[in-house]
Structure formats: structure tokens, C-alpha cells
Amino acid sequence: MNKVNILLTEANGNLSNSREMIINAIKTAEEYAFPKLKIDWDIDILVTNRIPMIIPENGAGGYTFSADFIRINIDDKKATKNLISENVVHELCHAARWGKNDEWTENLFDGIIFEGLACVLEAEFVKDKSEKTLFIKTILERTDKENEKILSELREQLDSNDYDYDMVFFNGNDKLPRWSGYSLGYYLVKKYLEKTNKKIEDAFADKYTEFKIAL
């Protein structure tokens, strides 16, 4: 049976008391994403509190290195089972895509779609949960009009690989709100799903060029 293999960094002892909660959180994400995305290989997940949080408010964050290796960063004072599960689901979407589609992101458009796919899966996972990360709540509350404005600001850069990643996806500026790349990706992927009559589990491994119909 394919599964996640969980490793916690415990040398400083800060995660020891949360070990059971962390494992349960990851298992919840695994039980949701593995059958939905038809993940048929093992995935190693390293959980650590040794790396500064990119989004401090979330309590948990992640980075997917490959189809079978994910790192989850947590704030052991803020992280809850729900917040960890939500982040793991997001990262499992990245891992699943790489396991079924070996395309690299070659430009800003590809990166936006890559993150948008994971945001859609994450949003579906939390839709009936009262506790959500500030990140996904912000993505879901952003209007179509606001996302169209973001698209207008970024349109000329979509085919370029020379852009400010932190500004587009995280910090924003006077014209782009925080997490613009993620919310635009969510918006475009949702449009793609509507146009193709697909569900996220049918579309997460589609070629990047196919998503151009959402523009």
C-alpha cells in the first residue's frame, strides 16, 4: 500500500509533545489526497520547526522538492491539526502533479497555474471546515474583479521567466495585493475547470499550455 513516510526533526524537543497530532494531521491529508489524485507511490514528508515561516500567520507551510519528497515547516506554538492537514494537501497536489507530469515551470504563467491547482485542491479540502489558514481565506475572499485586475497587471509578464517571485506570490506591492500569484492561479484554474467541465482530480496533471484557454 502506498503511503507517506513521516520524519520529525526532534533534536530540540519542541515537536515531541505534538508528535501524535502532527502524524494524525498528515494521515488526514494522505487519506484525502492519495485516492483523489491516484497517488500510487510513497512520499517522504519531513516536518520541522527549524525553518522560519514564510507565512507566519498560517502556523504551517510547506515546500515540495520532488514527486516523493515534501518538507512541512510548522510553528509549534500556532500549528493545529487542521492547519497542518491543509498545508499537506496543498503540497501533495504539487507532488502528485510531478509524479504524473514531468513538465518544469518555464515562465510566470506556468508557475501561477502550478500554484492555482494546489489552491483549488486545498480549497475543496477545507470547504466544510471552520478553521482555515489566513492564506486560503484570503484567496477565497478575493473577487473575480480583483483577480482580473491582477491579471491585467501581470499579463505582459506571463510568458517571461524573469519576474520577482516574492513580489508576485508573496509580498505584493502598491499594485499587487499579497499572494497575487496564488489567487490568480486559483481563479484561472477554476475558469479552466468550468470551461472543460473537469474536476480538479481530472485536471491537476494537464499540460500548462492547455490552461491558456482560461486567459
Give the predicted meaning of each segment.
Residues 1-10:
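N-terminal, Lys/Arg- and Ser/Thr-rich interaction peptides
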Residues 72-87, 109:
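Short pre-active-site segment immediately N-terminal to the catalytic Zn-binding motif
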Residues 86-99:
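Active-site recognition of the HExxH zinc-binding catalytic motif
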Residues 152-215:
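Pan-zinc metallopeptidase signature
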Residues 99-108, 128-137, 195, 199-202:
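Inter-helical turn/loop segments and adjacent helix faces that build the functional surface
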Residues 108-153:
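Post-HExxH zinc-binding segment in Zn-dependent metallohydrolases
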Residues 9-67:
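Auxiliary, metal-adjacent structural segments of Zn-dependent hydrolase domains
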